[in-house]
Design a protein with these regions (language model features):
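Loop segments that connect adjacent transmembrane helices in multi-pass transporters
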Residues: 236, 240-257, 328-376, 448, ...
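Alpha-helical segments in transporter systems
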Residues: 159-184, 201, 205, 223-224, ...
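Transmembrane helix-loop-helix hairpins at lipid-water interfaces of multipass membrane proteins
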Residues: 162-215, 222, 294-299, 410-414
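Cysteine-nucleophile protease catalytic domains, especially the papain-like/related folds used
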Residues: 1-74, 87-88, 98
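Transmembrane helices of ABC transporter permease
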Residues: 203-212, 216, 278-328, 399-412, ...
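Noncatalytic regulatory segments and standalone regulatory/sensor domains
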Residues: 15, 38-45, 51, 72-167, ...
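Cytosolic ends of transmembrane helices, especially the final helix of ABC transmembrane type-1 domains
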Residues: 332, 336, 351-355, 379, ...
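ABC-type nucleotide-binding domain
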Residues: 470-722
Length: 722
């Protein structure tokens, strides 16, 4: 098992080190999954993340700080934290310590290095992660090689691809008929004046050309069909997998980087479906060409054999040059795409703040960076093609030069020389293609790494879980809940809270107190570090996410509307919307009038993300969407912040009706007008419940809520005076 592991990007060093240590103990895991375990984000991985990831992999791990002498006593391999060039925080695997040097595995280049004591001492921060197999550790290999993945793509279509390959082989063999035809024409037909043989061979060549055309046509059709099927498998499979990934993935990955993987899927399809067939075909042509050349005249064939090592050297150099450059091309292209998507999604903000020049500069910087690496890639291609072309032309001249000498000496006939020359021309084309194939191979390999690392990530587990039905819903219990985002920001530490069924519960608190996080946890968007959240007697971990999220409807702070009409956005996910239900919900919310004033009423197209609506109208659509599903638990996260007083009154009346129907309503709000109708108010501060009671109780008790109440009351009075 390979112990050296190279990091993919600057944030990967910790995960790559952990993968290397795991490989030392015969455990192979994808680096992408270890990143997921470790909570690696745009800042990288911290020590806590490495320790927790090691635990999930079956190891016992501990982060320690030691002195220089301890470095020689600890069990190895271990992970050491260093600072490179006094700037870059980095992890390396400590392999061996001797009196003369420290041996490490550096994920920066994925290689072993022996470093002198003094040099390592300058870099080492004293921090180590000690790792050893635990009781639950098992030797296993969960990595899937690119070759196996490629075969899994090919296998369902191997019959069609084999037919295409067989047709291509026949096509290439028939192509060699031209060289035989030229030889016979010069040596037999022209000297003998055999007109009947000329006509016979001419007709045969016409038939061969027609047959080659038909073979080429059907091969192209087969490849087109197979390509579409592979595209469907890769692209749709990728999209379906994306939707099953946990929310943390989308928090840490930019949209442009996610979209760029679709381009990677196209590169993989191109390689699997077309290039691989052409590569096999070209190798076959080279073999057949050599056989024919030795058949015509072995002395000239030896000259051709001599140039094979030269072509091999060109291929090797091209491979070395392309390996690193092509990965950088894809990464910088993805970075540019991410910047473009981000800036276009924020076009309104850019205009409002006059950030056009700033945004242009950011985009231009990434574009120039991409152009620089594309230029290097282009130079590599020019070197490869020019070198191959030069060798091909020189060898052609050499063959004619030497061959003409043999023809003058009567060792070879003029027809055989021309036939040989024709085969040489047939030979040099595939050689150029094979060497050019190197870049496509690199592209496909890198694209496979980038795409399949997403497939390696663990999805939300839906197996062997309970379907939550409306009648199963009861009080909501948070029991000793401990949660943090990734391995950095702790939000809750032993949170205990009960939300009664059939009540309107308001959750108040300053920004950053954990209100919105509470909502996310209730929909099981994030995994808890410890504790339990129960609806009735059912732990959220034992419920399917689909059924949970149907029962719990949320109106979030940030509203996402889809490109479609009003009905599409209210009855989202319903292929046959219940118009009676849509109108009923809109009437309750007092929305019908404003919808009917739109150009096409309920069929009005809203534009991307509801661009044609005001903020308040968007919020009302979002509230209607949540109510359309008839949820047992409704959560409003600052959901009325953009509403006018009349619209808010309709929402409050609707919420009151839900209480009468014994539904649970949770309101996250700062505005007293929303909190005013709550049966109970919970006040959070720094992830803890600091106050819990009715509005009347909390408004007279000195504490955070009263200060907020007093502050808003003063603001209202001042506004009235003004």
């Amino acid at each position: 098992m390979k112990i050296t592991v190279k990091q993919r990007d600057i944030t990967d060093c910790g995960a790559a080190c952990l993968a290397s240590v795991a490989a030392w103990y015969k455990l192979a895991l994808p680096v992408a999954r270890i990143r997921q375990f470790a909570g690696t984000d745009k800042k990288g991985t911290n020590i806590l993340g490495l320790v927790e990831a090691a635990g999930k992999m079956g190891f016992l791990a501990k982060g320690v700080r030691g002195d220089w002498d301890s470095l020689f006593k600890i069990p190895k391999p271990a992970i050491a934290h260093i600072i490179v060039k006094e700037v870059l925080h980095h992890y390396v695997v400590l392999i061996k310590t001797t009196d003369k040097y420290i041996e490490i595995m550096d994920p920066g280049d994925g290689a072993f290095h022996k470093i002198e004591h003094e040099e390592f001492r300058k870099q080492w921060t004293g921090v180590l992660v000690l790792i050893a197999p635990g009781e639950k550790f098992t030797v296993r290999n969960e990595k899937v090689s690119a070759q196996v993945r490629f075969w899994n793509l090919i296998r369902p279509h191997k019959g069609i691809l084999l037919q295409s390959l067989a047709g291509a082989l026949v096509f290439s063999v028939l192509g060699l008929a031209m060289s035989i035809y030229v030889g016979k024409l010069v040596d037999t037909i022209l000297p003998g004046g055999n007109l009947s043989l000329l006509n016979l061979l001419g007709i045969a060549m016409v038939l061969i050309i027609v047959l080659r055309l038909l073979l080429s046509f059907f091969q192209s059709v087969f490849i087109l069909k197979t390509g579409q099927k592979i595209d469907a498998t890769l692209i749709l499979g990728y999209y379906q997998h994306l939707l099953k990934l946990p929310q943390t993935f989308f928090d840490n990955m930019r949209t442009g980087e996610i979209i760029s993987r679709i381009g990677d899927a196209v590169k993989i399809r191109l390689f699997v479906n077309e290039v691989s067939i052409n590569f096999i075909l070209n190798i076959f042509i080279l073999i057949v060409s050599f056989i024919l050349m030795f058949t015509f005249f072995w002395k000239l064939a030896l000259i051709m054999l001599i140039v094979v090592p030269i072509y091999t050297l060109i291929y090797y150099i091209s491979n070395r040059l392309n390996r690193k450059v092509q990965r950088t091309v894809m990464e910088r292209a993805a970075d540019l795409e991410a910047q473009l998507v981000e800036s276009l999604n924020s076009a309104g903000t850019i205009k409002r703040f006059g950030l056009e020049n700033f945004s242009n500069l950011k985009t231009e910087t990434r574009f120039v960076s991409l152009l620089e690496i594309i230029y290097k890639s282009g130079l590599n291609s020019i070197f490869s093609s020019s070198s191959t072309s030069l060798i091909s032309q020189l060898i052609t001249i050499l063959v004619l030069w030497v061959g003409a000498g043999y023809a003058i000496g009567s060792q070879i006939t003029p027809g055989e020389l021309l036939s040989f020359y024709s085969v040489v021309g047939y030979f040099t084309g595939p050689v150029t293609s094979v060497i050019g194939f190197n870049r496509t191979l690199q592209d496909a390999g890198i694209a496979a790494d980038r795409l399949f690392e997403i497939f390696d990530l663990e999805i939300e587990d839906e197996a062997n879980k309970i379907e939550l039905e409306p009648e199963m819903v009861d009080d909501i219990h948070f029991e000793n809940v401990k949660f943090r985002y990734g391995t950095r920001v702790e939000v809750f530490d032993s949170l205990n809270l009960t939300i009664k069924k059939g009540e309107i519960t308001a959750v108040a608190g300053e920004s950053g107190s954990g209100k919105t996080t509470l909502v996310s946890l209730l929909q099981n968007l994030y995994a808890l570090q410890a504790g339990h959240i129960r609806i009735g007697r059912y732990d959220l971990r034992h419920l399917t996410n689909q059924s949970l999220r149907k029962v719990v409807s949320v109106v979030p702070q940030r509203i996402d509307l889809f490109s479609g009409n009003v009905v599409d956005n209210i009855a989202v996910g319903d292929f046959t919307p219940d118009m009676n239900r849509v109108i009923e919900v809109c009437d309750k919310l007092g929305m019908t009038k404003f919808i009917e004033q739109l150009p096409h009423g309920f069929n009005t197209y809203l534009g991307e993300n509801g661009a044609t609506l005001s903020g308040g109208q968007q919020q009302r659509i979002a509230i209607a969407r949540a109510l359309y599903r008839n949820p047992e638990i409704l959560i409003l996260d600052e959901a009325t912040s953009s509403l006018d007083s009349l619209a808010e009154t309709f929402v409050q009346n609707t919420i009151s009706l839900l209480r009468e129907e014994n539904k649970t309503v949770i309101v996250i709000a700062h505005r007293l007008s929303t909190i005013n109708m709550a049966d109970r108010v919970i006040v959070l501060d720094k992830g803890m419940v600091v106050q819990d009671g009715s509005l009347a109780e909390l408004s007279v008790i000195e504490g955070p809520f009263r200060r907020m109440w007093t502050h808003q009351t003063i603001d209202i009075k001042e506004t009235v005076k003004t």
